Amino acid sequence: MIQSKRQQGASFEYQARLFLERQGLTFIAANQRFNCGELDLIMQDQQTIVFVEVRQRKNQIFGSAIDSVDWKKQQKWLDAANLWLAQYDSSLEDADCRFDLVAFGATTNDIQWIPNFLDE
């Protein structure tokens, strides 16, 4: 059965969630949409809110999953996180948060987790 891109994305996001939960993170929310962008996963690592971007690439013709998170995507990620935090009377300036990337290759077994991706 052929999956749509949305179904494939949801599948990889779910696999990323399970992976992060095995690493000790707690699930908060998924697919939080704002005008500026979407937050794939929101997790918690002890007291830290973790905004997770999930990326997948079947091949590297146009670059890796990691390479696909360009400056424009990073800005949308930051803006969406700030809007999510604002719902709780918080902001990036005062919240204990970080931005992690979970990147998949062709399969869910080919996974790379990069904590603090935006600090790299």
Curated annotation (Swiss-Prot):
Gene Ontology molecular function? nucleic acid binding
Quote any Pfam family the record assigns: UPF0102
Q: Which superkingdom, per the lineage?
A: Bacteria
Q: Which InterPro entries match?
A: Restrct_endonuc-II-like, tRNA_endonuc-like_dom_sf, UPF0102_YraN-like
Family per record:
Belongs to the UPF0102 family.
User: Which PANTHER family does its entry note?
Assistant: UPF0102 PROTEIN YRAN
Task: Write down what this protein is called.
Answer: UPF0102 protein HSM_1206
